[in-house]
From Swiss-Prot:
Organism listed in the record: Sendai virus (strain Ohita)
Name of the protein described by the UniProt record: Protein W
UniProt keyword terms in alphabetical order: Phosphoprotein
Keyword Phosphoprotein among UniProt keywords: yes
Region (Disordered): 1-23, 54-318
Coiled coil: none
Note: The P/V/C gene has two overlapping open reading frames. One encodes the P/V/W proteins and the other the C/Y proteins.
Compositional bias of kind Basic and acidic residues: 7-20, 99-110, 150-168, 175-193
């Protein structure tokens, strides 16, 4: 009797192993039939069946068929843990409050988003633009009267007047040159920066921080061409050398032998009255005209002199 029971049990296990693949497919079909044949009121009342997992890969002997009232055969797993069944029942009982809470949270988020956008809760689609610049917000009105930054004003002016962009393109200059600061002059930089004239000075930008821009050769060439067109600074001193006549060298073809001798300075009365400091000046003899005889006691210069002993001797000998 026991051997017959064991043989029949082994045969049933072999049959189940052979038909394992067909049973998994039939289980899914049976579950779908049960769902489609159930009424909507039953689905709304109990949703625990939604949380039951479908195990298509099951070992043989782990499934059995259950026939319910007014329903087809539904295959359920006999190896399911009781804990999973309890969790499914608990989740099925609490699924409806969770769905309501989720719906309320979604409504609150929609209300908060619509309030922040300044529109009503009914009008969910928002106006994102006129089609040309969709997604680009217009400039907010300057209600507080605060001064705007120069870059914003220039960008706004460039957007309002597209002719300036055409002027830049006509001149062959990129748009960055119009907004960039001119390069400082080397001489002005030495005077202003205490000798640091080669250091570039650029204005601070609040929107661009920590970005090192490497200029291209074309951009540098355009900037140099623009700086050349600037008017010269009238306050800068000219660096032309002053020619001194005394230090001027003669031309190479000049002959030194033909140079005129330096002129003597005119003599003054001090040279005669101060013989110590000035050289002696030769004075011509004043001879009387022929036929006249000067007085022996009167010299040629007109001043009377006393006779010396030699003069007396010559007179006596004569």
């Amino acid at each position: 009797m026991d051997q017959d029971a064991l043989i029949s049990k082994e045969d049933s296990e072999v049959e189940r192993e052979a038909s394992g693949g067909r049973e998994s497919l039939s289980d899914v079909i049976g579950f779908l039939d049960a769902v489609l044949s159930s009424e909507p009121t039953d689905i709304g009342g109990d949703r625990s069946w939604l949380h039951n997992t479908i195990n298509t890969l099951q070992r043989p002997g782990s499934t059995h068929r259950v026939k319910g009232e007014g329903e087809g055969e539904v295959s359920t797993s006999s190896t399911q843990d009781n804990r999973s069944g309890e969790e499914s029942r608990v989740s099925g009982g609490t699924s409806e409050p969770e769905a309501e809470a989720h719906a309320r949270n979604v409504d609150k988020q929609n209300i908060h988003w619509a309030t922040g956008r300044g529109a009503s809760t009914d009008s969910v689609p928002q106006d994102l633009g006129n089609g040309r610049d969709s997604g680009i917000l217009e400039d907010p009105p300057n209600e507080g009267g605060y001064p705007r930054s120069g870059a914003e004003d220039e960008n706004r002016e460039m957007a309002a007047n597209p002719d300036k962009r055409g002027e830049d393109q006509a001149e062959g200059l990129p748009e960055e040159i119009r907004r960039s600061a001119p390069l400082p002059d080397e001489r002005e930089g030495r005077a202003d920066n205490n000798g640091r004239g080669v250091e570039p000075g650029s204005p601070h930008s609040a929107r661009v921080t920590g970005v090192l821009v490497i200029p291209s050769p074309e951009l540098e060439e355009a900037v140099l061409q623009r700086n050349k067109r600037r008017p010269a600074n009238s306050g800068s001193r000219s660096l032309t050398p002053v020619v001194v006549p005394s230090t001027r060298s003669p031309p190479p073809d000049h002959d030194n032998s033909t140079r005129s001798p330096p002129r003597k300075p005119p003599t003054t009365q001090d040279e005669h009255t101060n013989p110590r400091n000035t050289p002696a000046v030769r004075i011509k003899d004043r001879r009387p005209p022929t036929g006249t005889r000067s007085a022996p006691d009167r010299p040629t210069d007109g001043y009377p002199t006393h006779p010396s002993p030699e003069t007396d001797a010559t007179k006596k000998g004569a």
